[in-house]
């Protein structure tokens, strides 16, 4: 049995769920845990709802991480991010929840989430949050200072 055989979404017909669901996230074993690649994932079609007005909010989500023993399966990540479609939450809360869900799933060495949301009322909101294990705290602090 290969590690990929445990993945539910990859290669299967896709049922789209449009209400937040962290159970959609899946991981597979890191084939090179001795290396430290900085992996960037970009979702250009992120949508959630304003919790006050119920109007749709649109943005681009950037996720960067250095894996430890597990890596996120990209189709499951797409389905997870799409599950925010009818979820009412502020931009900052969405970004924080994405980080917490991925940290829980992956237990990475380092992980950051940045949201570049379309401006509303002339104000663009661009939240950034990051996480690191003890050995990567200096990297975390540098990334936080360098965040756009």
From Swiss-Prot:
Catalytic residues (positions): 50, 57
Domain of life, per lineage: Bacteria
Record-level GO BP terms: queuosine biosynthetic process; tRNA modification
Binding positions for substrate per the UniProt entry: 72-74, 91-92
Subcellular location: Cytoplasm
Listed pathway(s): tRNA modification; tRNA-queuosine biosynthesis
MF GO annotations: preQ1 synthase activity
Annotated EC: 1.7.1.13
Major site of localization recorded for this protein: cytoplasm
Cellular-component GO terms for this entry: cytoplasm
Keywords attached to this entry: Cytoplasm, NADP, Oxidoreductase, Queuosine biosynthesis
Uppermost EC category: oxidoreductase
Catalytic activity: 7-aminomethyl-7-carbaguanine + 2 NADP(+) = 7-cyano-7-deazaguanine + 2 NADPH + 3 H(+)
Summary of the function given for this chain in its UniProt record: Catalyzes the NADPH-dependent reduction of 7-cyano-7-deazaguanine (preQ0) to 7-aminomethyl-7-deazaguanine (preQ1).
Family according to the record: Belongs to the GTP cyclohydrolase I family. QueF type 1 subfamily.
Protein name: NADPH-dependent 7-cyano-7-deazaguanine reductase
């Amino acid at each position: 049995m290969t590690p990929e055989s445990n993945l539910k979404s990859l290669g299967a017909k896709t049922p789209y769920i449009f209400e937040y669901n962290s159970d959609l996230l899946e991981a597979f074993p890191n084939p090179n845990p001795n290396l430290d690649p900085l992996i960037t994932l970009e979702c250009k079609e992120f949508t959630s709802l304003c919790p006050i007005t119920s109007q749709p909010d649109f943005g681009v989500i950037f996720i960067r991480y250095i894996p430890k023993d597990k890596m996120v399966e990209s189709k499951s990540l797409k389905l997870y991010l799409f599950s925010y479609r009818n979820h009412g939450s502020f931009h900052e809360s969405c970004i924080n929840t994405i980080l917490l869900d991925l940290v829980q799933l992956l237990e990475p060495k380092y992980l950051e989430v940045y949201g570049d949301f379309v401006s509303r009322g002339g104000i663009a909101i661009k939240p950034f949050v990051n996480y690191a294990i003890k050995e990567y705290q200096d990297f975390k602090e540098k990334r936080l200072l360098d965040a756009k």
